[in-house]
C-alpha cells in the first residue's frame, strides 16, 4: 500500500472540509489550512440543493438540529414587476455557512483532522513531494488539494489563465429578518445583476446578490448603488425597505469569475470553486462543492491502495469524472446567466418561461444533478 498516507488541503470551505472528513475516514492523516477561525460568514447564497442531502445525512451530522429551512418553490422577478413562479421538484434547504461550515469543522476535528489557521503563501512540487509554505514554516506532503475557493494569490503563482482576465462581478451578502414564505427562494433581477433571497436558520433570511462592478463605480458606496440600481426592481425595493438588516456591514467579495478553470496544476488537485464555479442563479454551487470533494476523495482513497502512487492515472480519472459530472452544468449556468441582469432580455425570458412551464423545468434539470 502507498505510504505515507498524508495529505494537505488548502482551504476550509465546503469542498475542503468534505475532503478532509472523507480522507481522514479513509485512513489518511489530513492537515487542512484555513486563514480564518470557525465560525465565520462567507459570501454565499446559502441554499443547498437536496442532491447533497443524502450524502450529508450519511455522515450523521445531525443537520436538523441546526434548524435549516425546507425550500421547494422558486420565484423570479423583473424590474417591471413581473414574477415567474415554479416548483423545485428536488428542492433544497437553507442554512448559513456560519453554521454549516462550523458543523463540518467540528466533525472533522473529532475525526483527527489537523487544522492550521494560517495563510498559505506558496506551493511547490519538488522530487515527488509538495512543499506548502505558510507564515509559520514549510510543510511537506506527497498529495495536496487546493480548495481555497473562488480566487486566491495562489492562482497567480500557478499562472491560472482566469486570474489575468478581470472579472466584472462582485458579490454582496446580508442576513436579514423579513416576511417571506419559508419555502421560497426568490431571484430578483436588476440592471447588471440579480439577487437571491431565501430563509436559513433561526428565522433569518439570506440576501445575496451578484452585480457588475460597473454599477458600484457609478456611486459612492454599496448603499447608494443599492438605492439607485437594485431598488428599480419593486420586489427588491420592498425587501430592502421592509427588512431588518443584521450583522452591520455586508460581506463583500470582488473579482468573481465563472470562466473554466484547470483541475490540475503541477499535480496539485483543484476542488470546489477552485476547480470551477457555477453561476449563483443555478442555486447548487454548494452541492457541487460537496459532490466534487466526494468524487476526488474516493478516487484518492482507491489509488492509495496501490503499492505505488500513479499520479497520472489518478489525475486522468479525476479529470474524466469531474468533466462528466459538472462540465455541462457549469456551461449551462454560464449560458443561463446571459438571460439575467439585462432588463430587456430578462423581461422576455420571464414572459416566455411563464408560458412554457416544461421549458422552465428543463432548465432547472440542466443545471442540477442527481442525488449523490
PLM regions: where:
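FAD/FMN-dependent oxidoreductases across multiple families
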Residues: 122, 138, 217, 221-299, ...
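N-terminal Rossmann-fold NAD(P) dinucleotide-binding loop
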Residues: 16-17
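Predominantly flavin-linked oxidoreductase catalytic cores and closely associated redox partners
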Residues: 107-236
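A conserved beta-strand/loop capping segment in the N-terminal third of enzymes
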Residues: 52-103
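Glycine-rich FAD pyrophosphate-binding loop
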Residues: 10, 24-44
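Conserved N-terminal glycine-rich FAD pyrophosphate-binding loop of Rossmann-like flavoproteins
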Residues: 37-57
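Beta1/beta-strand and adjacent pyrophosphate-binding region of the FAD-binding site
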Residues: 2-13
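C-terminal helical "tail/cap" subdomain of flavin- and related membrane-associated enzymes
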Residues: 298-372
